[in-house]
Amino acid sequence: MSDCHPVLLPEGPFSREQAMAVTTAYRNVLIEDDQGTHFRLVIHNAEGQLRWRCWNFEPDAGKQLNPYLASEGILRQ
């Protein structure tokens, strides 16, 4: 197994910097609906289908996204 470790979010709301770390680490995670102060983080599966998305300010946003990052996230090489 490689030394790649999943990049996860805090269990609650997350910052733009935290979202950028995740989008940099994964090929299939994107920021959408960027309103400046708030935005959605979106995860697609390997086939490109939407798996999950959350606004960055949701109280349990990271808790909702982290299982999908761990199971569906495609780490960049």
Curated annotation (Swiss-Prot):
It holds the Pfam family DUF905. Gene3D superfamilies: ykff protein like domains. It comes from the Bacteria. Belongs to the UPF0401 family. This is UPF0401 protein c5157.
